[in-house]
């Protein structure tokens, strides 16, 4: 069977193991071809090709449900569920998404992008099935990294107390998440995987059985049962954790042995309650470069298949905000042993891998456990340390209660660096960092700031570590502005003070964070039309620089706010409320992300769709200025890409 001819995953039923192995080869070839050209997640999908095919041999995908945790390992799933022909459009605007989306395919049973949700969702589906008297299988596929997340363990705890609810959890154990997983559970899985009896059974015994004179290639059912019995006798603690929690445990089994997985999944489906099949896979399987560097090839930009090296950028780029943050934090930690960097399984993405290498004693990786990371930092701050928590904006949403309850209310000196704040591009709506402005400004005692460039980031980091309360700094994905950087001696910023970047009498533009460069470009375009703008870099969301902004707004009378975040409750709302509370009522135009989900595309395409390029903003502002001349009545106007408040 050729993969391009596969119209439905059920067409895989009845194929021999040899035929399935040929399909697996085609999946890897297509996977590598597309990701090498367009970029995307590489290692996770390559590692689960056989697992996917074996599992789907035992399911009826017209009715059975499969929930893939996170979804970045589901490229093989997409290739056998009707998206082969469109796969070249992976992660491109209007094309195949990099994660699972219910609106994209009937076979994407649950959307995802964040880790540790699959078991809860699959259990919910199983309970809905049983309550309605229906008959279908529910399966969650979760990695060993995601299993460290508290939500996954909560779901296992719940499911284990429902002995009559059939649910299959497939543990994809590749000893990795994005980076190597951490914690006691991960160590336990590693001991199971590498124990001498397990290695002996997985290798020597099976190989000896295969070479018995009356044996062919695959072991018959009788010897498979003998092998499983020997496995349990030799390693009595295998799976004890899961069995104590109410699951029937099966494994560990070879995640690249199609026949063994099919037999095991078939047996697991016959269990009348929760079952867990522990599958050992190799991340990056089938591509030597990805197997050798499982962190580096977790996700890749476009690269050369022959060499495995990234294709060189057409133009050199400044260092990323993440890298500047990591380098600066290392310098600070070298001077202050009380500063500690904390990440939730995202060391490389946040720049904390630099601290991990330079000063491992001042670095903590808690695994996929954002809630724990925040309260751990709070505890450290209570007893004299200065923790710096670096987490993606979208993932910090998971710890909102801890930020309020454990940090904000107690006014503890914890610094949060929110990476990937704003538009992130090809990862789509689950990863856009568009909500942090709105949720951070509501938390008591927090100081919230965003730098206009990477040099200002350095100063904000120093300022936060000298401040007596909690601070949050949002930084965007990608390269900085290319401004000169200092190696040390950074001057702290006065808390709550913005700066004027440009003077003009016709319009006040107040920009927050990385949108300052676009604000200045917009002001240049307006100046060519005769509109002179004062441009202010707000720097701080909380507290706002009322001392600077109120007189300017009162004098100029026309205000535009620009932010890379959701307008509802955002920076523009904060400034509008501050002005109205002071009985200052200028005409106000808020530019930012309206009440929409921002789909996968390049950042530039997303900005264009949202009307947030300098040319588009200049056009919106010209319309706003024209309307301001025609009315003095208070009104609210909504546009596709802007929200307008006029008075």
Swiss-Prot record:
Protein's UniProt keywords contain Signal: no
Family matches, as InterPro entries: Dxylulose-5-P_synthase, THDP-binding, Transketo_C/PFOR_II, Transketolase-like_Pyr-bd, Transketolase_BS, Transketolase_C, Transketolase_CS
UniProt cross-references to CDD domains, sorted A to Z: TPP_DXS, TPP_PYR_DXS_TK_like
Cited Gene3D superfamilies: 3.40.50.920, 3.40.50.970
Superkingdom of source: Bacteria
Gene Ontology biological-process entries: 1-deoxy-D-xylulose 5-phosphate biosynthetic process; isopentenyl diphosphate biosynthetic process, methylerythritol 4-phosphate pathway; terpenoid biosynthetic process; thiamine biosynthetic process
SMART domains: Transket_pyr
Residues where Mg(2+) binds: 144, 174
Amino acids binding thiamine diphosphate: 72, 113-115, 145-146, 174, 287, 370
Documented EC number(s): 2.2.1.7
Gene Ontology cellular component list: cytosol
GO molecular function, one term: magnesium ion binding
Catalytic activity: D-glyceraldehyde 3-phosphate + pyruvate + H(+) = 1-deoxy-D-xylulose 5-phosphate + CO2
Cofactor: Mg(2+); thiamine diphosphate
Pathway: Metabolic intermediate biosynthesis; 1-deoxy-D-xylulose 5-phosphate biosynthesis; 1-deoxy-D-xylulose 5-phosphate from D-glyceraldehyde 3-phosphate and pyruvate: step 1/1
Broad enzyme group: transferase
UniProt keyword annotations, A-Z: Isoprene biosynthesis, Magnesium, Metal-binding, Thiamine biosynthesis, Thiamine pyrophosphate, Transferase
Free-text cofactor note: Binds 1 Mg(2+) ion per subunit.
Similarity remark: Belongs to the transketolase family. DXPS subfamily.
Subunit structure: Homodimer.
NCBIfam families: dxs, PRK05444.2-2
Function: Catalyzes the acyloin condensation reaction between C atoms 2 and 3 of pyruvate and glyceraldehyde 3-phosphate to yield 1-deoxy-D-xylulose-5-phosphate (DXP).
Protein name per UniProt: 1-deoxy-D-xylulose-5-phosphate synthase
Organism field: Synechococcus sp. (strain WH7803)
């Amino acid at each position: 069977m050729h993969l391009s001819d596969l119209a439905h995953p059920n067409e895989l039923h009845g194929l021999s193991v040899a035929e399935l192995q040929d399909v697996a080869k085609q999946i890897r070839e297509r996977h590598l071809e597309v990701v090498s050209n367009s970029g995307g997640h590489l290692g996770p999908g390559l590692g689960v090709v056989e697992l996917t095919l074996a599992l789907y041999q035992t399911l009826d995908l017209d009715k059975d449900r499969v929930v893939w945790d996170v979804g970045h390992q589901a490229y093989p799933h997409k290739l056998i569920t009707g998206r082969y022909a469109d796969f070249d459009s992976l992660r491109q605007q209007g094309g195949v998404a990099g994660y699972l989306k219910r609106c994209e395919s009937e076979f994407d049973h649950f959307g995802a992008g964040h880790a540790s949700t699959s078991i809860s969702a699959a259990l919910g589906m199983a309970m809905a099935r049983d309550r309605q008297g229906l008959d279908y299988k529910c399966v969650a596929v979760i990695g060993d990294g995601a299993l460290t997340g508290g939500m996954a363990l909560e779901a296992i705890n719940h499911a284990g107390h429902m002995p009559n609810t059939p649910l299959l959890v497939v543990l994809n154990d590749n000893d990795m998440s994005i980076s190597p997983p951490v914690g006691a559970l991960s160590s336990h899985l590693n001991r199971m995987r590498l124990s001498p009896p397990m290695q002996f059974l997985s290798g020597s015994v099976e190989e000896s059985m295969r070479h018995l004179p009356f044996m062919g290639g695959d072991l018959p059912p009788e010897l498979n049962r003998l092998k499983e019995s020997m496995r349990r006798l030799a390693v009595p603690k295998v799976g004890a954790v899961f069995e104590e929690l109410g699951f029937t445990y099966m494994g560990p089994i070879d995640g690249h042995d199609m026949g063994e997985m099919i037999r095991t999944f078939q047996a697991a489906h016959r269990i009348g309650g929760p079952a867990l099949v522990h599958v050992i896979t190799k991340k990056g399987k089938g591509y030597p470069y990805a197997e050798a560097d499982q962190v580096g090839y977790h996700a890749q930009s476009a690269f050369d298949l022959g060499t495995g090296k990234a294709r060189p950028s057409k133009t050199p780029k400044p260092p990323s905000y993440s890298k500047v943050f990591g380098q600066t934090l290392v310098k600070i930690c070298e001077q202050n042993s009380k500063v500690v960097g904390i990440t939730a399984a995202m060391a490389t993405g946040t720049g904390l891998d630099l601290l991990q290498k330079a000063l491992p004693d001042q670095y903590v990786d808690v695994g996929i456990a954002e809630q724990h990371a925040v309260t751990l930092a709070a505890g450290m701050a209570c007893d004299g340390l200065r923790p710096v928590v670096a987490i993606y904006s979208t993932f910090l949403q998971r710890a909102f209660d801890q930020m309020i309850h454990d940090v904000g209310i107690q006014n503890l000196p914890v610094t949060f660096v929110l990476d990937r704040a704003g538009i992130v591009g090809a990862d789509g709506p689950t990863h856009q960092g568009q909500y942090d402005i709105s949720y951070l400004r509501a938390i008591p005692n927090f100081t919230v700031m965003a730098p206009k460039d990477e040099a200002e980031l350095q100063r904000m980091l120093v300022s936060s570590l000298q401040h007596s309360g909690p601070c949050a700094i949002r930084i965007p994905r990608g390269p900085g502005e290319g401004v000169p950087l200092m190696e040390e001696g950074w001057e702290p910023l006065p808390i709550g003070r913005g700066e004027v970047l440009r003077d003009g009498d016709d319009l006040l533009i107040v920009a927050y964070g990385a949108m300052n460069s676009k604000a200045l470009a917009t002001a240049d375009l307006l100046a060519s039309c005769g509109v002179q703008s004062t441009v202010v870099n707000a720097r701080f969301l909380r507290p706002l620089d009322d001392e600077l902004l109120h007189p300017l707004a009162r004098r100029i009378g026309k205000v535009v706010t620009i932010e890379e975040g959701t307008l509802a409750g955002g920076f523009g709302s904060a400034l509008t409320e501050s002005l109205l509370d002071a009985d200052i009522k200028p005409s106000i135009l808020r530019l930012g992300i309206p009440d929409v989900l921002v789909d996968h595309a390049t950042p530039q395409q997303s900005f264009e769709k949202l009307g947030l390029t300098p040319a588009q903003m200049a056009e919106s502002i010209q319309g706003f200025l024209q309307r301001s001349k025609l009315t003095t009545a208070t009104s609210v106007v909504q546009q596709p890409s802007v929200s307008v408040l006029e008075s």
